C-alpha cells in the first residue's frame, strides 16, 4: 500500500486546492484503486459498485458518471507525471510505443466525445454504428514476465468533421467547440510530446498500415529528427521500387526519386522466399525459429527508403 500511496500522491497534486478539486482528487485516486483491485471488470457501473462496497464511499450515481465523463480533468499534466513514474521505459536503448485508434461505446446521450461511429470490427451480434467515443491512443510496449504488455501513455478524442460543423454538445468543452484535427495529426502531437519528454531516447512507433504513411512520418520526423522511426504492417498490394541510381556526370535533369518497379509486396514475397534465413526471436513468451528476409526499397506512401521484412511460415 505504501507503493500505491507514493504513486497516487504525485497524481493528486495536479488537482486544485478548492473543495471541488479535493473531492475530484480523492475520487480520482479511489477510482484508480478500484481499477487495480481484481474485484470485477472496469466498466463504470462496476467501478461505482466497488467504491461503495470496498471503500465505503457514498456518492450519487449521476455525480460519479459526471466525474467519469468530465472533459476538464488535467490529463496532460497527469500523463506527464505517469511518464516520470516509469522506472525504466526503454527497451534495448529505445522507446517502443504502440499507436492505434479504438472506440468506447456509451449509453448516455450527452457524454463528451460521443458520436455515431462506423465500427469496421463489429461482430455479427453487434451494431455497426454504435454511439461511442473515438480515441487515438499511444502506449508503451514493455516485456513483463516474458510477454509484451502495453502501458497507455496518452490519448486524444477524435471528432468527425460533420460533428464539429454541427456544433454538437458532445464536441464542446466549457461551451466551446473543439477544433477539428485528423487522427494522424492527433497521433503526431502525442508522439512529439513523448519525444520531448524523453529528449535523448530513440522513439519507435509500432502501428498498423493505416498510420504508416508520410502524413504521420513527415511532421514527427521534422521535429524529432533521426530519433523517430515507424514499424508498421505493409499492405499486400503496396508497390515497391528499387532505390534510384546515382546521378551520372553530365546527366541532364534532376535525379530520379525512385528506381525500377519491383512489384507488389506479395509478388516480391514469392521471389525472395528462397533467400529467407532462420532467426530466433522471442514470440509469445518463448524463443522460436522464424524464417525472414529483408530488403531496403522505396515506397511512394512514405517517399523515402524503407526496410521491408517478409516473415514466412514454416
Language-model regions, residue ranges each:
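Non-membrane alpha-helical secondary structure
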Residues: 3, 7, 24-25, 56, ...
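Structural motif
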Residues: 18-28, 125-131
Amino acid at each position: 500500500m505504501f507503493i500505491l500511496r507514493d504513486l497516487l500522491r504525485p497524481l493528486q497534486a495536479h488537482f486544485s486546492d478548492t473543495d471541488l478539486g479535493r473531492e475530484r482528487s480523492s475520487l480520482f485516486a479511489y477510482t484508480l484503486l478500484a481499477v487495480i483491485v481484481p474485484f470485477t471488470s472496469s466498466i463504470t457501473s462496476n467501478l461505482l459498485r466497488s467504491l461503495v462496497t470496498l471503500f465505503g464511499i457514498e456518492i450519487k450515481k449521476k455525480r460519479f458518471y459526471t466525474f467519469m465523463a468530465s472533459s476538464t480533468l488535467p490529463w496532460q499534466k497527469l500523463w506527464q507525471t505517469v511518464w516520470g513514474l516509469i522506472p525504466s521505459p526503454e527497451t534495448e536503448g529505445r522507446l517502443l510505443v504502440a499507436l492505434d485508434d479504438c472506440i468506447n461505446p456509451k449509453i448516455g446521450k450527452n457524454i463528451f466525445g460521443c458520436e455515431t461511429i462506423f465500427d469496421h470490427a463489429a461482430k455479427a451480434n453487434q451494431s455497426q454504428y454504435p454511439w461511442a467515443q473515438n480515441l487515438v491512443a499511444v502506449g508503451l510496449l514493455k516485456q513483463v514476465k516474458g510477454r509484451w504488455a502495453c502501458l497507455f501513455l496518452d490519448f486524444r478524442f477524435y471528432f468527425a468533421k460533420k460533428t464539429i460543423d454541427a456544433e454538437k454538445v458532445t464536441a464542446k468543452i466549457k461551451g466551446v467547440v473543439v477544433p477539428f484535427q485528423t487522427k494522424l495529426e492527433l497521433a503526431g502531437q502525442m508522439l512529439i510530446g513523448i519525444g520531448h519528454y524523453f529528449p535523448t531516447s530513440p522513439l519507435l512507433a509500432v502501428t498498423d498500415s493505416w498510420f504508416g504513411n508520410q502524413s504521420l512520418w513527415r511532421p514527427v520526423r521534422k521535429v524529432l529528427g533521426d530519433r523517430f522511426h515507424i514499424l508498421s504492417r505493409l499492405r499486400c498490394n503496396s508497390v515497391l521500387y528499387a532505390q534510384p541510381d546515382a546521378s551520372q556526370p553530365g546527366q541532364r535533369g534532376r535525379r530520379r526519386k525512385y528506381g525500377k518497379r519491383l512489384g507488389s509486396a506479395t509478388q516480391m514475397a514469392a521471389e525472395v522466399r528462397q533467400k529467407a534465413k532462420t532467426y530466433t526471436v522471442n514470440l509469445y513468451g518463448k524463443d522460436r525459429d522464424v524464417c525472414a528476409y529483408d530488403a531496403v526499397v522505396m515506397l511512394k506512401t512514405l517517399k523515402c527508403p524503407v526496410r521491408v521484412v517478409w516473415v514466412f511460415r514454416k
